[in-house]
Design a protein with these regions (language model features):
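Hydrophobic alpha-helical transmembrane segments of multi-pass integral membrane proteins
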Residues: 1-179
């Protein structure tokens, strides 16, 4: 949990700096920063929110099943943060290589998180009745996976291959919001 909180704080500070930079850009003090809107959005969503969720979901799942706090999965943490770093390089430059690589790493980290959560559940000796809330949170992670896939596919133009009709950006935003 602690590494995720450290990264949350880091992304929070960077998001504030990016917001200040946007203000300076708007006032033509630092005009070269135009086009960084989506970078700020992703600092908040990927940086802050994702770090908090990836850090707390395993703990809450273990607590629900009366299991000890799980150890930090450094592989998940590293994949998530390497992916975010690559996305934060690729998004403002619209470079496909860091975007696809970063999206793939975040997708892999999310998949490993789902596997970790399933493993926590199977470690439990007591069988919990399936609750609607659990289905909701599992669906949320799957929507997040869809949002990652669509967001990664925005720049290489995967819309047709993914069967998306209309604005791919809207699909990406709404999938991540539901996730």
């Amino acid at each position: 949990m602690i590494p995720y909180l450290i990264m949350t704080f880091l992304y929070f500070v960077v998001a504030i700096v990016a917001a200040l930079a946007a203000s300076f850009s708007m006032w033509n003090i630092l005009s070269w920063i135009h086009g960084m809107v989506w970078l700020r959005v992703h600092f908040i969503t990927l940086g802050i929110v994702t770090q908090l969720l990836f850090g707390t979901i395993p703990i809450l799942t273990a607590k629900t099943h009366n299991l000890p706090r799980p150890k930090t999965r450094w592989d998940i943490w590293l994949l998530l943060n390497a992916g975010i770093a690559l996305l934060l390089v690729g998004i403002p430059t619209t470079n496909k290589i860091p975007i696809i690589t970063g999206g793939t790493l975040v997708f892999t980290a999310t998949t490993l998180l789902l596997i970790q959560l399933a493993g926590i559940r199977t470690q439990s000796e007591k069988t919990l009745a399936v609750k609607e809330g659990r289905k909701f949170y599992i669906a949320g992670l799957f929507y997040f996976l869809i949002g990652i896939l669509v967001g990664t596919g925005m720049f290489p133009d995967w819309a047709e291959a993914l069967g998306i009709v209309g604005d791919i950006g809207e699909v990406h935003i709404h999938a991540n919001n539901w996730g």
